[in-house]
From Swiss-Prot:
Induction data: Expressed early in the viral lytic cycle.
UniProt lineage: Viruses, Duplodnaviria, Heunggongvirae, Peploviricota, Herviviricetes
Residue intervals annotated with topology Extracellular: 1-40, 89-95, 160-192, 250-269
Effect listed in the UniProt record for changing residue 282 to A: About 60% loss of constitutive Gi signaling
Protein's name according to its UniProt entry: G-protein coupled receptor BILF1
Cellular component GO terms, alphabetical: host cell mitochondrial outer membrane; host cell plasma membrane; mitochondrial outer membrane
Source organism (scientific name): Epstein-Barr virus (strain B95-8) (HHV-4)
Amino acid sequence: MLSTMAPGSTVGTLVANMTSVNATEDACTKSYSAFLSGMTSLLLVLLILLTLAGILFIIFVRKLVHRMDVWLIALLIELLLWVLGKMIQEFSSTGLCLLTQNMMFLGLMCSVWTHLGMALEKTLALFSRTPKRTSHRNVCLYLMGVFCLVLLLIIILLITMGPDANLNRGPNMCREGPTKGMHTAVQGLKAGCYLLAAVLIVLLTVIIIWKLLRTKFGRKPRLICNVTFTGLICAFSWFMLSLPLLFLGEAGSLGFDCTESLVARYYPGPAACLALLLIILYAWSFSHFMDSLKNQVTVTARYFRRVPSQST
C-alpha cells in the first residue's frame, strides 16, 4: 500500500519552506551596502596588485636567494588565490561559487601547512649543530606535497558534492556545501585543520623557547621575544579561524543562510589586508631568526676551531 501525507502537513511544509527562503532573501538584501561593496572591491584589487608586486620582486630582484624567499613567495601565492576567489565573488552576481570557494579553500588550506612548515624548519634549525645549506629542494618538495594533497582533497569534495552543486546563498555570497549537512562537514574539516595548526604552532613555539633558554646565545632575549610574539600571533589567527567548531551543533546554521550583519558579509576584505601584513611580519621574523641562528653557529664553530690551535 502507498502511504500518503495529510494535505495539511504538505501545505504547512511548503509554507514553511517559502517563509524560510523569503527570510533568507530579505537578510541578503538588508546586509548589502553599495558603499561597502565598492570599498571591498577596491581593497581586493589593491591587495592583488600588492601581492603580484611582491611575487615579482622576489623572483626578479631577490632571485629566490634565501630559503625565506621560497616560503614567502608560497604565502603570497596562497593569499593571491584567496583574494582572487573573493574578488570574483564580489564582481559576479552568482558568485561562481563552485570555482571561487575551491580557490579560496586551496589558498587558505595550503597556507595552514606552509606556516607549519616554517615553524618546523625553525625548530629543526635550532637543534642543528652546523649551518644549514642554502638548497631550496626540501622546501619546494614540501610545498608541492602540500599543494597536491589539498588539491586531492578538493577533488574528493567535488566528487562528493557533484559538479552541479549549488553553493550560492545570495548575491555575491557562497556557502561551503549544497546542503546543511555538507556545509557543516566542510566547515568542520576546515576549522579542525586550523585548530590543529594552532595547537602545533604553539607546541613548536614552546619547544623553540625551551631550547633557546638552555642555549648560550648572545641575542637570546631578542630571539625569545621574536619567537614568542610571532608564534602567538600566528597561533591566535588560526585559533580564530577554528571558532566555527563551537557552532557545529546547529547543523550548518553558521554561514549557510544570509544574515543581516554587515560585518559577516564584508569582513573578508580587511581580513585579507591584515593577512598580508601578518605574512610580511612572519617572513621578516623567520628571516631574522634563521640569520641570527646561522651567525651564532658560525661564530661558535670558529671559536672551537681556534681553541685547539691556541692550546698547542
